[in-house]
């Protein structure tokens, strides 16, 4: 299975009310995929959000990366993704954090550890077929 690697620039950053909509398909043999909200285009840039569905371990991990170091992982309850099935994720910037909505259900509200205004790039990668990435 070939890994997806897609990047979309956000030159204006992220502010309260910004919505990122990711639509795709989880392949039958998928292990993991991720959506990263990065603070720069350089290798090793800080990540304001690392959203990481792990089908191989049936969990979704949320985290940040600052100065090359990962923070404390947070996990949602259950895994709202299934191999061979399409999905829609909304990442919504709020005053408090990033709200992750999968399908019609709020999944987790990840509290800001880095200012969302620093975000410059959305990166989608791993075992996923990306259909669309829209920023509203």
From Swiss-Prot:
Keyword Amino-acid biosynthesis belongs to the record: no
Name this polypeptide is given: Galectin-7
Cell location: Cytoplasm; Nucleus; Secreted
Domain spans labelled Galectin: 6-136
Role this protein plays: Could be involved in cell-cell and/or cell-matrix interactions necessary for normal growth control. Pro-apoptotic protein that functions intracellularly upstream of JNK activation and cytochrome c release.
Subunit relationships: Monomer.
Record gene name: Lgals7
Lineage, opening ranks: Eukaryota, Metazoa, Chordata, Craniata, Vertebrata
Annotated residues for binding of a beta-D-galactoside: 70-76
MF annotations from Gene Ontology: carbohydrate binding
One GO biological process term: apoptotic process
Keyword Electron transport annotated: no
Gene Ontology CC annotation, any one: extracellular region
Keywords: Apoptosis, Cytoplasm, Lectin, Nucleus, Secreted
Xref: InterPro entries: ConA-like_dom_sf, Galectin-like, Galectin_CRD
């Amino acid at each position: 299975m070939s890994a997806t690697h897609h990047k979309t620039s956000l030159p204006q950053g992220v502010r309260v009310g910004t919505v990122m909509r990711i639509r795709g398909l989880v392949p039958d043999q998928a292990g993991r995929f991720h959506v990263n909200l990065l603070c720069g285009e350089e290798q090793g840039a800080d990540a304001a959000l690392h959203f990481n569905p792990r089908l191989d371990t049936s969990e979704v991990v949320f985290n940040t990366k600052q100065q090359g170091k990962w923070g404390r992982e947070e996990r949602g309850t259950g895994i709202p993704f299934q191999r061979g099935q399409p999905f829609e994720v909304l990442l919504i910037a709020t005053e408090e954090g990033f709200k992750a909505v999968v399908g019609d259900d709020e999944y987790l509200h990840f509290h800001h550890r880095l200012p969302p205004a620093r975000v410059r790039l959305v990166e989608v990668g791993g075992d996923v077929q990306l259909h669309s990435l829209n920023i509203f």
